[in-house]
Amino acid sequence: MEQRYATSPEQVPGMDTAELRRRYLVEDLFAEGEVHAVYTHHDRVVLAGIVPTGDALDLPTFPEIASTTFFEHREAGIVNVGGPGTITVDGETHDLAHGSCLYVGRGADGVSFRSADPAGEAGPARFYLFSAPAHTAHPTTLVEAGGGTVRELGDQLTANRRTLNQYVHENGVKSCQVVMGVTTLHPGSTWNTMPAHTHDRRTEVYLYFGLPAGDRVVHLLGQPAETRHLLVADGQAVVSPSWSIHSGVGTAAYSFVWAMAGENQAFDDMDGVPVAELR
C-alpha cells in the first residue's frame, strides 16, 4: 500500500508536472494477478485495484490501517471496470458484470475477488475499490450496471452530454459516508463536469475507464483561480482534495467512476464555478 499525505492549495503553484502527477494521479492501480492500493490522508480514503487472473484474490489487511480486517472500521464501494467477475463477502458470492457496483459495509469479512473468464474476449475483471472509515454497519448491496438513480446531463451542443448513474448515495444504497456512481459520456461528447465545481466538505476521486489506449483525458485540478492539468490514461485515477475543481475533456468519449467521502452525502452540496472565472 502506497501512502500519500494531504496537501494544501498553496503548494500547487510551485509543483512541476512530475510532482503534480505524484501527488494526485494514481497511474499503476491495476496489475494482473495483484492487489494495488493507495492510502490518501485526504479524508483517509483508500483506493485499490484488484485484477484476479487465476485463483481468487483476497483483500489484504494492510498494516497501514491498523485493523484486524480491512472492513473492521471501514466501508467500500466496488465497481467492476473489466470483464465479468465475482466478489465473495461473508460466504455469499455476488456476480458483477462490467459497470456493476457492490457496496460492502463495516464488519464484512472473508472478502475475495475472482474473474469469470480471465482468458476470454472481455479479459479479467478489474475491480476498483473506494473505501472510507465507517461508524456503523450497512448491508452488502449489489447494483447492476446502468441501475441506481439515473440523471441525464449536459447537451450535445456543448460536447458534454452524459448519463450519470448514482449507485451509493443518500437516496439509494445506504452507507456511512461513501458516495459512488458511474458517468458515461455519449458519443461525440468529451467534457465532464463543466462548468466545474468544488466540494469544500468532501474529497472526490475520479477513475477513468473505457478510454482507448492511444487517447487521454486532460483533467483539470487546483483552485478555480489557479488551475493545473494532468494527462490521464485509461484505468488511472485522480484524487481531488476538497479545495480542488475536478473536470476534464477527452480526446475520445469515456466513462468514469466518481466517488466521494467527507462531511455529508448530499449530491448537490457543491460550490459551482462559472467558466469565465477559471484561470
UniProtKB/Swiss-Prot annotation:
Annotated cofactor note: Binds 1 zinc ion per subunit.
EC primary class: isomerase
GO biological process: one example: pectin catabolic process
Pathway annotation: Glycan metabolism; pectin degradation; 2-dehydro-3-deoxy-D-gluconate from pectin: step 4/5
Highest taxon, organism lineage: Bacteria
MF (Gene Ontology): 4-deoxy-L-threo-5-hexosulose-uronate ketol-isomerase activity; zinc ion binding
Alphabetical list of PANTHER family matching this protein: 4-DEOXY-L-THREO-5-HEXOSULOSE-URONATE KETOL-ISOMERASE
Protein name, as recorded: 4-deoxy-L-threo-5-hexosulose-uronate ketol-isomerase
Record lineage: Bacteria, Bacillati, Actinomycetota, Actinomycetes, Kineosporiales
Originating gene: kduI
